[in-house]
Every structure is written in structure tokens, then in C-alpha cells.
A protein has these predicted regions:
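Catalytic center-proximal scaffold of phosphoryl-transfer enzymes
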Residues: 1-302
Length: 302
């Protein structure tokens, strides 16, 4: 079965996956996340080494949503830098420093991660006096999320205006409070780390205010990569780098099909039934006939 999948991916599916990457890089807003994966037979590496599966996603309201998975042997910033070398736009990420290697983009950092840092800083006894600061941080950030829920259905331009009126003052107050509250905290405590997470990445947390299409959370990328994480618990590892590449490509097709309202099995069956008769190698534009938003594909694969 695995050898058959490798051949099918190499001969047919890979061409659609590459086409989806080109389409994704035309989009101005992306969500990015990564998770570890074990890959055997990597040159010069032990089988127990951690490799990574990266996911690059369209925003929620994208006309043509794409979920692109890419296997790489590491987590270094050189991998997103290479993927996004010609890209200009906004990327939603966590505060991992590896993304600093990506030039020509604006990073929108994830408030869900920031709130989680303060939740982790809460003592087990919430009545403990040490709970007051993390609890206040959580309440302040919850105000932001509550407003975002109210603005969810607004068009981008109007959402931007409302954010500047309603959210910007809250952010200014939060960072002013954080600067004062961080003073005197034990350097290695969870609360001190949460404050530093906020204060050291302030610019990235503010960037979403520039454009109403941007989000305050990178949860979309986490949700996109979750099917891979769940699958990993069952199949445990990839048998080779080629297998990991094929796995990334097939996850790309399956999750992109789902994002476009298609039945993944029908979609892949449609590709493999029709593509062998296509002259796509001589005419690469024919690959557009197999993209998940093509009207004929939507007709047969829902």
C-alpha cells in the first residue's frame, strides 16, 4: 500500500500539490504552524531524530482556501524563509524566533498563545494572592476576545475601524499594566515568562490592527494541523523522506478538499480517474481543471 501511494503521489498528485502552493503564495494572509514527526532513513540522522511537518493555511474567509503541508528535517527558520522567499503579506504565527528569518512580511502574533501563558502561570489555588496578576491578565485579554466575537461578521474595513476604536485602548492599557506588573517577579517563574512573552513581542501583537483581514489568533493553523497530529498517534512515523513528502502532499489534498466543502475520497478519485488523460505536462495550465474550486470538480466531488 505504501509503495503504491508513493508512486501515485510521484506520478500524479504531486503536480496538483505544487499548483496549490503557487496559488497559496498569491494570497496576502497566511496562518503557519509546525509539529514534530519521526522520519526514518534520513541521510546523516538517527531514526530517533525529530523532523517537522509545517502547515501553511489560508485565512478563514479566503475565497479559495488552501491547507498546505510541507515536510522538512528540522524546525530552523530557514525552512519558512525558503517557503516564503517571494511572499509579501501578513503571516499569523506564534512567537517562535525561527519566523524572524522570514523577510518582507508582517507577523501577527497569537493572543491565544499569550493568554495560555498567563493561564499556565495561575497557581493551583486560585485564592492564593499570587493568582491576582495572571487572573487580571486573563480578564484583560478576554475583553479583547469578546469584542472580536462581536466583530466577527463585519467586513474587513469596518472591522479595522472598530478595532481601533474599541480594542486599541484596551491594548494600550494592557501593555502599560504589564510593564508595571512585571517588575519584581522572579525571573524564572511562569508569570515572569508570560510577561516577557508579551513585552518582548509587543510589535507582533499589535500588527493585526493594520488590516481587518488579520486575526488575533493562530488557532486556525493549529486546527489545520490537528488531523496530522491525530494520525501520527496511529502510524507513528514515516518510513523515509520520500514517504514523509508524500504524506505531506496527501494531507494537503485531503485537508484542502475539506476546506472547500469536497469529499476527499471523491476528490482524489476524480483526479486519478481523469488526470491520466490530460496533457498537463505539455500544458501546465490544464492543472487548473483539478483545483478544488473548479466548478466541475465541485459538481462531482461534493
Amino acid at each position: 500500500m505504501s509503495n503504491w501511494l508513493l508512486v501515485v503521489y510521484r506520478d500524479w498528485l504531486v503536480h496538483i500539490v505544487h499548483r496549490l502552493k503557487l496559488e497559496l503564495l498569491k494570497q496576502r494572509y497566511l496562518h503557519i504552524d509546525e509539529t514534530h514527526v519521526q522520519v526514518l532513513k534520513e541521510p546523516g540522522r538517527k531514526n530517533t531524530s525529530d523532523s517537522y511537518m509545517w502547515v501553511y493555511c489560508s485565512i478563514r474567509d479566503a475565497v479559495n482556501p488552501i491547507r498546505y503541508f510541507e515536510y522538512q528535517p528540522g524546525r530552523s527558520g530557514k525552512y519558512p524563509e525558503a517557503f516564503l522567499r517571494e511572499y509579501e503579506g501578513y503571516i499569523h504565527t506564534d512567537a517562535y524566533s525561527g519566523y524572524n528569518a522570514v523577510s518582507g512580511v508582517k507577523r501577527c502574533l497569537c493572543y491565544t498563545h499569550l493568554r495560555r501563558a498567563f493561564v499556565d502561570a495561575l497557581p493551583k489555588d486560585i485564592h492564593n494572592s499570587e493568582a491576582s496578576k495572571p487572573a487580571e491578565a486573563i480578564l484583560r485579554l478576554n475583553q479583547l476576545f469578546n469584542i472580536e466575537s462581536e466583530l466577527e461578521t463585519l467586513p474587513p474595513d469596518q472591522k479595522k475601524k472598530e478595532r481601533l476604536i474599541r480594542e486599541k485602548p484596551l491594548l494600550e492599557a494592557f501593555w502599560s499594566w504589564a510593564e508595571k506588573s512585571a517588575i519584581g517577579e522572579l525571573p524564572k517563574s511562569k508569570l515572569s515568562k508570560a510577561f516577557h512573552y508579551a513585552l518582548n513581542n509587543r510589535e507582533g501583537f499589535w500588527n493585526y490592527l493594520e488590516d481587518g483581514n488579520c486575526s488575533i489568533s493562530n488557532s486556525l493553523a493549529e486546527n489545520c494541523i490537528r488531523p496530522f497530529v491525530i494520525g501520527r498517534k496511529n502510524w507513528l512515523f514515516s518510513g523515509s523522506p520520500k514517504g514523509a513528502e508524500a504524506s505531506a502532499g496527501i494531507y494537503t489534498l485531503v485537508e484542502t478538499a475539506k476546506a472547500n466543502g469536497l469529499a476527499p475520497m471523491k476528490y482524489i478519485k476524480y483526479i486519478l480517474s481523469d488526470m491520466p488523460g490530460s496533457a498537463f505536462l505539455e500544458h501546465p495550465e490544464y492543472l487548473d481543471d483539478y483545483l478544488p474550486w473548479n466548478p466541475l470538480v465541485k459538481e462531482f466531488c461534493r
